[in-house]
Amino acid sequence: MIINAKGPASFAEKYIVRSIWDNKFPPGSILPAERELSELIGVTRTTLREVLQRLARDGWLKIQHGKPTQVNNFWETSGLNILETIADLNPEGFPVLVDQLLSARTNVSAIYFRGALRNNPDQAVDVLAGIHQLENTAEAFAEFDYQLHHRLAFSSGNPLYVLILNGFKGLYSRVGRYYFSSSDARALALNFYVELEKLALAKNYIDVPAVMRSYGINSGKMWQRLRDDMPADIAQDKS
């Protein structure tokens, strides 16, 4: 097992998570005793204890006082906060993960975009006014697109959508910079922003789903053109 880590705690965390992913520690199994596991990984028991607590908070493990530590089925117990970890564990499956991420965001965004234009159209107009000063660069478009979603999610009246977006942020920021490196993708997005601004100015929330659906289809086709050339290191969080 080859693991790149910045320190003992990071190494221990990646070792355990990789072992769970590779089914060395399958769901429902019991982790080795603390002393044995710390010797196996090569870290102190104090460091291991901190790592186990962190992994339990993320849903990988179940820790109960007086009982051995049990491995969870993370698909049932974890949240969006492990997306970065899954991308790191399975780089070969990263394009599919991105497909699923974009599909989920498209479906959810149709709800909060409509909610924002219905409940706070003036705030939507204010956000969308930024398109008139938007630089024609991948970085500028990726940042604007994220902020657009984030602010309209807040304006929708349901802040839980913001928490969902926060779970996407790291991966989406990196993928977004790659996607918007295409001038065609930027042109497609700009046209979508313009149409959305027209709806916001008219306080027309009824037609938002149709505009979102059209952009979702077209941007999905654009992504399929671009995904096979996506650099492999986008899966890695270098922060």
From Swiss-Prot:
Domain of life: Bacteria
Organism for this UniProt entry: Shewanella denitrificans (strain OS217 / ATCC BAA-1090 / DSM 15013)
Entry GO CC: cytoplasm
Assembly, per entry: Homodimer.
CDD domains linked: WHTH_GntR
The keyword Transcription appears for this protein: yes
InterPro entries: FA-response_TF_FadR, FadR_C, TF_FadR/GntR_C, Tscrpt_reg_HTH_GntR, WH-like_DNA-bd_sf, WH_DNA-bd_sf
Pfam families according to UniProt: FadR_C, GntR
Major site of localization recorded for this protein: cytoplasm
GO molecular function: DNA binding; DNA-binding transcription factor activity; fatty-acyl-CoA binding
Classification lineage: Bacteria, Pseudomonadati, Pseudomonadota, Gammaproteobacteria, Alteromonadales
Domain HTH gntR-type, residue spans: 6-74
Keywords: Activator, Cytoplasm, DNA-binding, Fatty acid metabolism, Lipid metabolism, Repressor, Transcription, Transcription regulation
Biological process terms in GO annotation: fatty acid metabolic process; regulation of fatty acid metabolic process
Role, per record: Multifunctional regulator of fatty acid metabolism.
Subcellular location: Cytoplasm
Protein name, as recorded: Fatty acid metabolism regulator protein
DNA-binding region: 34-53
UniProt KW Cytoplasm keyword: yes
SMART domains documented for this protein: HTH_GNTR
